[in-house]
């Protein structure tokens, strides 16, 4: 049976659960939080009506979901060779031949094209930023840097930080220092998050010959790098001074709490996996709490 002529190599069509794995729905959903926060902050700071802005928000969320999901599907297509080596990737439909390459590419490019149309309907800046995110993630991260340099995580952080900027421009139609500040928060957050994950999967990345920082430079060098990015996060709440001193204080406490955890939870060499897990879990909570603060504090200020 020709793989290019059927939806899957095994019996039955791709399930919704498998579709979510193909487009990395968990990653997409996580990025929709800062995307919405960007739109919400633009509405509040520019005194727009929330009700009249709902169509823009919905179109932005749909467009963002489609371009991110499409780019992730294309990443899965390109990474099939290394995913087959890594134990944590064995459930992916692209690894166990649940979807053909032809249909995977149709799904990927179809989602990205429709998503870009949605963003360009909103305005040109949103569409352009979305396109830059696609090109950055697929070309500069997936195809080039992921397999060739330990700077891959930092390079991938550029396209990974565009969701709140798209959210902002969907409402305002132009960039601002506030949008750039949101970008910088996500940009600095990503290396800490993904280095922690890379420590946990160090052996897998080494086996697949992917030059993640822990696999090439070791744990101590990676830990130092994570603290550098934690320090860079510290001043960023002050760039969002429009949200007031309460937000700055609470966001700074979030940052200091992360630094404290990093300093106190590592006792001995054998603890590095436990330490990485704690840092990874904190990173997930940090993302939600930070942007929840953005929304809640701005709502309180508006009242």
Curated annotation (Swiss-Prot):
Pathway(s) it belongs to = Porphyrin-containing compound metabolism; heme O biosynthesis; heme O from protoheme: step 1/1
Q: Which UniProt keywords apply?
A: Cell membrane, Heme biosynthesis, Membrane, Transferase, Transmembrane, Transmembrane helix
One GO MF term: protoheme IX farnesyltransferase activity
Q: Name one GO biological process term.
A: heme O biosynthetic process
Gene Ontology cellular component? Answer: plasma membrane
Q: Is Coiled coil included in the keywords of this UniProt record? A: no
Q: How does it sit in the membrane?
A: Multi-pass membrane protein
> What InterPro entries has UniProt attached to this entry?
Protohaem_IX_farnesylTrfase (IPR006369), UbiA_prenyltransferase (IPR000537), UbiA_sf (IPR044878)
Q: Which reaction does it catalyse?
A: heme b + (2E,6E)-farnesyl diphosphate + H2O = Fe(II)-heme o + diphosphate
Q: Where in the cell is it found?
A: Cell membrane
> For this protein, what is the EC number?
2.5.1.141
CDD domains assigned to the protein according to its UniProt record, in alphabetical order:
PT_UbiA_Cox10 (cd13957)
- Which Pfam families does this entry report, sorted A to Z? UbiA
Enumerate the transmembrane spans: 25-45, 54-74, 104-124, 125-145, 151-171, 179-199, 228-248, 280-300
Q: Which family does it belong to?
A: Belongs to the UbiA prenyltransferase family. Protoheme IX farnesyltransferase subfamily.
The UniProt record's further free-text remark is: Carbon 2 of the heme B porphyrin ring is defined according to the Fischer nomenclature.
Record-linked NCBIfam families? cyoE_ctaB (TIGR01473)
Annotated PANTHER family: PROTOHEME IX FARNESYLTRANSFERASE, MITOCHONDRIAL
Task: Summarize the subunit comment.
Answer: Interacts with CtaA.
What is known about what this protein does? Converts heme B (protoheme IX) to heme O by substitution of the vinyl group on carbon 2 of heme B porphyrin ring with a hydroxyethyl farnesyl side group.
Q: What name does this protein carry?
A: Protoheme IX farnesyltransferase
């Amino acid at each position: 049976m020709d793989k290019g002529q059927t939806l899957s190599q095994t019996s039955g069509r791709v399930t919704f659960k498998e579709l979510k794995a193909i487009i990395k729905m968990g990653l997409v959903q996580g990025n929709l939080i800062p995307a919405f926060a960007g739109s919400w902050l633009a509405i509040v700071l520019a005194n727009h009506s929330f009700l009249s802005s709902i169509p823009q928000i919905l179109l932005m969320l749909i467009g963002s979901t489609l371009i991110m999901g499409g780019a992730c599907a294309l990443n899965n297509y390109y990474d099939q060779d290394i995913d087959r080596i890594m134990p944590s990737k064995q459930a992916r439909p692209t690894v166990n031949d649940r979807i053909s390459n032809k249909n995977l590419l149709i799904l990927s490019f179809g989602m990205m094209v429709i998503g870009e149309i949605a963003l360009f309907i909103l305005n040109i800046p949103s569409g352009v930023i979305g396109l830059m995110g696609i090109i950055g993630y697929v070309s500069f991260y997936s195809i080039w840097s992921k397999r060739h340099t330990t700077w891959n995580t930092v390079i991938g952080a550029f396209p990974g930080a565009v969701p709140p900027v798209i959210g902002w421009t969907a409402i305002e139609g132009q960039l601002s220092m506030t949008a750039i500040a949101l970008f910088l928060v996500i940009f600095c957050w990503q290396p800490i998050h993904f280095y922690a994950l890379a420590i946990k999967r160090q052996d897998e990345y080494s086996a697949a010959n992917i030059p993640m920082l822990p696999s090439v430079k070791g744990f101590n060098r990676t830990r130092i790098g994570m603290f550098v990015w934690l320090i860079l996060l510290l001043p960023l709440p002050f760039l969002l001074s429009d949200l007031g001193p309460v937000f700055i204080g609470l966001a700074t406490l979030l940052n200091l709490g992360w630094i404290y955890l990093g300093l106190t939870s590592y006792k001995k060499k054998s603890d590095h996996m436990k330490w990485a897990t704690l840092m990874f879990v904190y990173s997930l909570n940090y993302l939600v709490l930070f942007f929840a603060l953005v929304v809640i504090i701005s709502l309180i200020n508006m009242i």
